[in-house]
């Protein structure tokens, strides 16, 4: 895993988002930072106990404090926790400000992990202390709770930068298709988050993304084929 993170850091992709309390992830990040001499920005998305009790609040405070101890710059309550606070009737997220305050108290930047698109809308409408939001967004509408056009509109109307996730719809479309769609349809301030298993996948995703942003074709190998004359698959052609 350290090899994977090293590829990203060497290419200037210096932020990681997820549930970062797993020891092997923290160890791999430290190894990659040591090898490259570069620092990774940590965006932690911890599960919080959001029950309305004194014991639960104490537990949530401890979880948020642990995020700081891990070295996180950003702390976004996990969507499975944040969505428990949603009141669609009132258009609010009850008690969310309590947890955002806890995050600020620890010197971290608060945000929201949002699978429900309403979280972005309610956050903006109520002026919650949220600096960014995570939102599922891909060309297939995979796991998105409303149509693609609706999420696109929410992203463009959002008051803060949106961190989009699942651009390849969990492997249901190719990186070329998924990443080009995402980069072409979000704002300059927004982000695309990718999940990778190998350093080779990281290299490919970075090249496709840079090509999309620079409006050029990506420098990728063609598909392999036992027939060396299959020009359409190899990506090679001869000028006449």
Predicted regions and their residues:
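Eukaryote-skewed repeat-based solenoidal scaffolds used as protein-protein interaction platforms
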Residues: 61, 65-72, 76-111, 115-127
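Histidine/lysine/aspartate-rich catalytic loop segments that bind and position anionic ligands
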Residues: 117-146
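Hydrophobic faces of well-ordered beta-strands that scaffold small-molecule active sites
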Residues: 15-18, 40-45, 75-77, 110-112, ...
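Charged helix-capping and loop-helix junction motifs
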Residues: 57-61, 90-97, 146-152, 175-181
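Glycine-enriched alpha-helix->loop->beta-strand junction motifs that scaffold or abut catalytic
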Residues: 36-37, 69-73, 104-106, 125-134, ...
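Active-site beta->alpha loop and helix N-cap motifs at the rims of alpha/beta catalytic domains
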Residues: 1-90
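Structured C-terminal cap/extension of enzyme domains
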Residues: 1-17, 33, 149-164, 168-240
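Active-site beta-loop-alpha junctions enriched in small/polar residues
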Residues: 21, 45-51, 80-82, 115-117, ...
């Amino acid at each position: 895993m350290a090899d994977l993170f090293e590829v990203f850091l060497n290419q200037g992709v210096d932020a990681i988002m997820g549930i970062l309390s797993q020891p092997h992830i923290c160890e791999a990040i430290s190894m990659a930072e040591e090898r490259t001499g570069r620092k990774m920005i940590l965006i932690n998305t911890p599960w919080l106990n959001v029950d309305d009790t004194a014991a639960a609040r104490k537990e949530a405070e401890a979880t948020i404090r642990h995020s700081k101890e891990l070295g996180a710059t950003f702390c976004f309550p996990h969507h499975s926790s944040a969505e428990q606070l949603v009141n669609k009737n009132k258009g609010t997220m009850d008690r969310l400000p309590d947890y955002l305050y806890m995050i600020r108290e620890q010197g971290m930047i608060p945000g929201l992990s949002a699978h429900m698109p309403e979280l972005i809308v309610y956050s903006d409408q109520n002026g919650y202390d949220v600096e960014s939001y995570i939102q599922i967004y891909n060309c297939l509408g995979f796991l998105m709770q409303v149509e693609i056009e609706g999420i696109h509109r929410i992203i463009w109307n959002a008051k803060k930068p949106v961190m989009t996730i699942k651009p390849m719809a969990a492997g249901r479309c190719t990186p070329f298709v998924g990443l080009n769609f995402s980069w072409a349809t979000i704002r300059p301030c927004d982000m695309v988050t990718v999940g990778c298993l190998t350093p080779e996948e990281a290299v490919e995703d970075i090249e496709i993304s840079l090509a999309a942003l620079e409006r050029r074709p990506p420098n990728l190998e063609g598909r392999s084929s036992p027939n060396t004359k299959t020009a359409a698959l190899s990506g090679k052609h001869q000028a006449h």
